[in-house]
Amino acid sequence: MKLMLDVHLDPGLADALRRRWPKLDVQSATEPGLAALSDPLLLEMLDEEGRVLVTRDVNTMPEHVKTRMCAGLTHGGVIFVPRTIAQTDTRQLLRRLTELIEREGNADWRSRVCWLKA
């Protein structure tokens, strides 16, 4: 499973996930060159890489995903983080992502959308 954490997530979460699973391919959109990408371009890039987006953007990202799907395009997969998980609660987010990765890390995530439970 390859993950991209969006700019709304603590970049330290990527390090925590890598410590938990040394072979997990995790990037943060805060890395140089990535933060400037528009959401549609980010989804296109992630589709090409087969990388799943983990995002807190529940306002505009669902519409971008829908637009891609309606155009017959795929995406790498999206995991939405609900607002009920506080932005400062990295520990809870790490726990929820850990549960999901353990349960479904080997699944095909192409064009799949998932909401983490709080």
Model segments located where?
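Acidic, PIN/NYN-like endoribonuclease modules and their adjacent C-terminal/linker elements
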Residues: K2-V7, P11, D15-K23, T30, ...
